[in-house]
Amino acid sequence: MIRHFLRDDDLSPEEQAEVLTLAADLKKTPFSRRPLEGPRGVAVIFEKNSTRTRFSFEMGIAQLGGHAIVVDGRSTQLGREETLEDTGAVLSRYVDAIVWRTFAQERLTAMASGASVPIVNALSDEFHPCQVLADLQTLAERKGKLAGLRMTYFGDGANNMAHSLMLGGVTAGVHVTIAAPDGFEPDPRFVDAARRRAAETGATVALTKDAKAGADGADVLVTDTWTSMGQENDGLDRVRPFRPFQVNADLLELADPAAVVLHCLPAHRGHEITDEVIDGPQSAVFDEAENRLHAQKALLVWLLEKR
């Protein structure tokens, strides 16, 4: 059966654990699995600009023995002169998987309904699930476990990282708190979905408008840019509500002494996170970025073996 990875809860807790175990193995032995030997191809489509996503997927596909066919969404007919369902059906005749970084989750869902190969969400407006796999791999390395950790995300609770951290985090048994200012809460649909999944794993989901309360005793502090791609012209009016949610030394002091700091990058230093914290000993930001490579390779291997 074809499996897609469009949102974090597309993997069950057991399946997520399988992918993370494989990611750890592939980090130790990068060329031990070659399911794309041939080479076989993976379509990698970008409607949004990318650095880490592009480099990590291209290199990962190469290490798996395959060839990445990388295209800019603007240079294709995606959703313009044929339906996305038809595009998914056609691309499935050429490649073994489709990786897509897009502006709209519904576009991924539409293409998946017509595709007969796995489709991977490399980022959408609602979710960033590959990033959260890398985050979880990083936490497992640093903490030696996932279940029972207390993770708080600070900033825009309505963005894709907050949604994916909720869904992916509770799938791993992590207690997730979203600390966000008024008006920037997570989508209630995804809060409900995360709480349903949390009921299976013994995790919890909490929302707070108090950054200090969110940091108190936390094992993991996560943040992301306050201004996502496409919001650059919103100016100071957008930034102002987030200032109390900056991850800085004072906030980190409230967390567990062995707390880990994550940021998916790119970071706006001096805004959502300070230099002192991102470059400090509790930061795992650059390990986290590296683990995009290993986690995504593991995901592709897992999906291809499910076909």
From Swiss-Prot:
Broad EC category: transferase
PROSITE patterns per the UniProt record, alphabetical: CARBAMOYLTRANSFERASE (PS00097)
HAMAP family in alphabetical order: OTCase
Pfam families registered for this protein in UniProt: OTCace, OTCace_N
Function in brief: Reversibly catalyzes the transfer of the carbamoyl group from carbamoyl phosphate (CP) to the N(epsilon) atom of ornithine (ORN) to produce L-citrulline, which is a substrate for argininosuccinate synthetase, the enzyme involved in the final step in arginine biosynthesis.
Residue sites binding carbamoyl phosphate per the record: 50-53, 77, 101, 128-131, 264-265, 292
One BP term from GO: citrulline biosynthetic process
Regulation: Inhibited by arginine, norvaline.
Cellular-component GO terms for this entry: cytoplasm
GO molecular function, one term: amino acid binding
Name of this chain's protein: Ornithine carbamoyltransferase
Species classification: Bacteria, Bacillati, Actinomycetota, Actinomycetes, Mycobacteriales
Amino-acid positions noted as binding L-ornithine in the UniProt annotation, renumbered to this chain: 160, 224, 228-229
Enzyme Commission number(s) of this protein: 2.1.3.3
Chain segments annotated as transmembrane: none
Pathway: Amino-acid biosynthesis; L-arginine biosynthesis; L-arginine from L-ornithine and carbamoyl phosphate: step 1/3
Catalytic activity: carbamoyl phosphate + L-ornithine = L-citrulline + phosphate + H(+)
Keywords assigned by UniProt, alphabetized: Amino-acid biosynthesis, Arginine biosynthesis, Cytoplasm, Transferase
Family of this protein: Belongs to the aspartate/ornithine carbamoyltransferase superfamily. OTCase family.
Localisation: Cytoplasm
Parts forming coiled coils: none
